[in-house]
């Protein structure tokens, strides 16, 4: 089946309506991208975490992540934040979207924050270190997460 699509021509009335939409105010909010990176290290299934070095959530363990820049996709932001916060310069290739978290007031900052979470399984990529707003980066065995460590990612 062949489908022909005719492009929309913007008439003056359509353009005027679009200008009106651009002027409409919307509540401010931020979009972040987080990434859960899993690997096998020392014969154990492990997750890459950071310790927050700044408020909010100072000292808490979290997934690497941060706010999107205006010129990047959520996937690009996840890759950039991974490098900035863990010094892990890996070509992830395919990121799988895990979930989007958008509950109002899930983040204590002034504006609403919506988070797109991704995950990836990679080969053991070696040691990591904290950078930018991460005090440190560490590999944590997943079986220890279930028992001893609580990862803070905000109420969802």
Region locations from a protein language model:
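Membrane-interfacial terminal anchoring regions of lipid-handling membrane enzymes
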Residues: 7, 22, 153-156
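Generic N-terminal leader/processing signal
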Residues: 6-7, 148
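Intrinsically disordered, low-complexity regions
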Residues: 5, 15-18, 119, 125
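N-terminal strand-loop-strand
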Residues: 15-62, 75
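Non-catalytic terminal extensions that flank enzyme cores
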Residues: 8, 12-15, 90-91
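Short, positively charged and aromatic/hydrophobic N-terminal segments
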Residues: 1-3, 9-10
């Amino acid at each position: 089946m062949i489908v022909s699509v005719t492009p929309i021509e913007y008439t003056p009335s359509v353009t005027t309506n679009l200008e009106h939409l651009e002027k409409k105010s919307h509540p401010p909010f931020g979009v972040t991208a987080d990434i859960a990176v899993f690997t096998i290290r020392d014969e154990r299934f492990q997750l890459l975490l950071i310790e927050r070095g700044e408020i909010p959530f100072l000292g808490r363990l979290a997934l690497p992540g941060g706010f999107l820049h205006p010129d990047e996709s959520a996937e690009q932001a996840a890759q950039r934040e991974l490098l900035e916060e863990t010094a892990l310069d890996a070509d992830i290739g395919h990121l799988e979207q895990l979930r989007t978290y958008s509950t109002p007031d899930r983040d204590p900052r002034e504006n609403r924050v919506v988070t797109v979470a991704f995950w990836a399984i990679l080969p053991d990529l070696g040691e990591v270190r904290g950078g930018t707003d991460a005090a440190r980066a560490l590999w944590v065995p997943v079986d220890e997460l279930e028992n001893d460590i609580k990862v803070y990612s905000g109420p969802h």
